[in-house]
Amino acid sequence: MTTRTTRWIAVALLCLAAIAAHAQPRDDTLYRELGGEPGLVALMDDFMPRLLADARMHPFFKEVDQADLKAKLVTQFCQVSGGPCVLKETDMRKKHDGFDISRGDFNRLVEVLQQSMDARGIPFAAQNRLLAKLAPMHREIVNVP
């Protein structure tokens, strides 16, 4: 190798090292405010029975595998809140196809989630940040006017 090539390689490696050294860590503040994974499991322990008890929500969830849904929601909330989880199934439109979910249905689910977050003592600011991260999903979930 020529001296010039060696210098370019050295400069490139130094640049890569500098970029790696300045990489921003994942912001897991919201995840921690929600109590981490144990807090999310506790939230779902409160949320799932409320969904089933709610007259408007019950038809959507009565035939769903509750344990599987709970695990997926914990993973989803973990991921969107900055936790270490990765949701493998991301096609929300496909998952909700055939359920005839209106904007009112979606909003009711959010209300039930807020009740659970209140019951768990999750600070209002953390609730708002979580809901802001989840809100864009309505475009893939709501499938009837």
Model-derived features with residue positions:
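Acidic/proline-rich low-complexity IDRs
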Residues: 12-15, 47
